[in-house]
């Protein structure tokens, strides 16, 4: 197996390096002190088309793969921005992969182009305070209504929820005790992060203040039926299409930070 970068991947590194050179130590120190989202940096990445690196061309993406996205994220993380720069965008790189894989053509066209164009930001609503890594034990509940679903529950350690317009939300549609396995009965939605029904509370951290971490209290959030991805009850299988790339990209980011150190 050849582990050398291709010419195209080296071009990705060089292009990212050019962008990151405009955002040095002073920029990231200021963001980490005042806690403001790095919007200027985010829009520079949008302008270069980098949020669509791993998405199909038919929705405005570049049609490249996760290996290419890893090259990009490693280059970002090896800059002055380190994990702050990487985590400001990586949800928008890996999170919607479940939409690209399992969404209808209408959903893909409705949801993916605004992310790639920087018109909408999204959050990843999976982790809960009482389930941790045991996703099958999450308790956020989506109940059917005449027009779709209504959701009650709680999520924690949700990045960028202060600025997100949308949320990729995993919720239980069938009680766990009625399922053969805990991972059954979960459904995946991509919907508005509506503050009228979602109380988003930022969690203070020792670092990476420019990328907010949050607890979200969800009280009767209405979700249209058209915002359900795929089949009801198959959400855990779908979310793996986002979670697996996330782990790979975070590994690449760690390598980038280590190389720069």
Q: At which residue positions do the language-model features occur?
A:
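Glycine-rich beta->alpha junctions and the first turn(s) of the following alpha-helix
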Residues: 2-8, 74, 78, 198-261
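Short Ser/Thr-interspersed hydrophobic loop/turn segments at strand-loop and sheet-helix junctions
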Residues: 49, 72-77, 171-173, 191-196, ...
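N-terminal glycine-rich flavin-associated loop
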Residues: 84-106, 132
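A short, Trp-centered hydrophobic/proline-enriched beta-strand micro-motif
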Residues: 118-126, 170
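A structural signal for short hydrophobic beta-strand segments in well-ordered beta-sheet cores
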Residues: 140-143
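A short core secondary-structure module
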Residues: 148, 152-201
